[in-house]
C-alpha cells in the first residue's frame, strides 16, 4: 500500500464518507489517480466504493480495523517476525496486527505452522506467499463479523497443543493493570490459548493505550513481551 493510499484511508476514516473530487483536491492528484487508489483499497477490503465517493466499512470487521495505522502495524509485524524461527509452530489469536504478522512470516520465513482461532487469518495466509506451510484452525462458535472462533470448544482444541509463542491483539490498555477487550467470548478464547503457550506476546499500536475495554484480557504480569 502506498503512502497516498494510507493517507486516503486516514481521511475516509475521519470523515466516514468522502467524495472522489474532495480527495483529489486534498491530495493534489487527478480524480483518475484517486479512483485507481480506491479500487486498490476496495480490493484489499479496506473500504467501499460508491458512485463518486468512498465510505468506511463496519469497524467490527477485521479488514477495516487493519486499515487504521496500517504502516505502524506493518512495522510491528515485521519486528515480531524476527523472534520466530524457520520451522517453528506458533499460536496466533485474532486481530489485524496478528494477521499482518502471519503475512510477514509467509513472505520471510520457511516451514511455519500457525495454530489460530481466526478464520480470517487462515484465509489471509492463503492469499500470501508460501512461508506458512500448515494452518490449524481451532474449532468453536463462529463470530461472523470478526471471523473468529470462540466458546468452550476453543479451549478443548487448544489443550491439544503446546507452543513456545502465542501472539495476541488487544482492544485497550489500563496502565499498571493490563490489557482489555470489548468482547468476553474473545477474551475467554485468548485465555484458553495462553494456557497452551510458554510465552504470550501482545501486538498493538499506541492508539490502543488510550482505549479501555470493559473486559480484562490479561494482567500485565502475564504478558511476556
Residue positions per predicted region:
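HTH-adjacent hinge/linker in prokaryotic transcriptional regulators
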Residues: 2-17, 21, 26-27, 32-94, ...
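Conserved phosphate- and dinucleotide-binding cores of soluble alpha/beta proteins
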Residues: 9-12, 19-23, 28, 43, ...
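Generic beta-structure capping elements
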Residues: 57-59, 95, 138, 170-171
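Amphipathic, non-transmembrane alpha-helical secondary structure
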Residues: 78-81, 85, 99, 103, ...
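Short beta->alpha connector loops
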Residues: 95-98, 207-209
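Conserved N-terminal glycine/acidic-rich loop preference
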Residues: 97, 115, 132-134
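Active-site catalytic microenvironments in core metabolic enzymes, especially phosphate/sugar-handling
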Residues: 117-120
Amino acid at each position: 500500500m502506498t503512502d497516498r493510499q494510507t493517507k486516503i484511508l486516514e481521511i475516509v476514516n475521519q470523515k466516514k464518507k468522502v467524495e472522489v473530487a474532495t480527495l483529489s483536491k486534498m491530495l493534489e492528484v487527478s480524480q483518475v489517480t484517486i479512483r485507481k487508489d480506491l479500487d486498490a483499497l476496495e480490493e484489499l477490503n479496506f473500504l467501499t466504493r460508491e458512485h463518486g465517493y468512498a465510505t468506511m466499512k463496519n469497524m467490527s470487521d477485521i479488514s477495516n480495523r487493519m486499515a487504521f495505522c496500517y504502516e505502524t502495524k506493518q512495522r510491528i509485524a515485521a519486528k515480531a517476525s524476527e523472534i520466530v524461527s524457520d520451522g517453528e509452530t506458533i499460536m496466533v489469536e485474532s486481530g489485524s496486527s496478528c494477521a499482518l504478522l502471519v503475512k510477514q512470516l509467509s513472505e520471510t520465513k520457511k516451514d511455519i505452522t500457525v495454530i489460530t482461532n481466526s478464520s480470517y487469518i487462515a484465509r489471509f495466509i492463503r492469499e500470501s506467499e508460501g512461508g506458512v506451510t500448515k494452518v490449524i484452525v481451532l474449532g468453536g462458535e463462529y463470530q461472523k463479523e470478526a471471523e473468529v472462533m470462540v466458546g468452550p470448544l476453543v479451549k478443548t482444541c487448544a489443550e491439544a497443543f503446546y507452543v513456545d509463542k502465542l501472539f495476541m491483539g488487544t482492544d485497550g490498555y489500563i496502565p499498571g493493570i493490563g490489557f482489555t477487550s470489548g468482547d468476553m467470548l474473545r477474551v475467554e478464547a485468548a485465555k484458553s490459548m495462553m494456557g497452551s503457550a510458554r510465552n504470550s506476546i501482545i501486538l498493538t499500536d499506541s492508539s490502543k493505550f488510550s482505549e479501555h475495554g470493559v473486559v480484562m484480557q490479561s494482567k500485565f504480569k502475564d504478558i511476556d513481551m
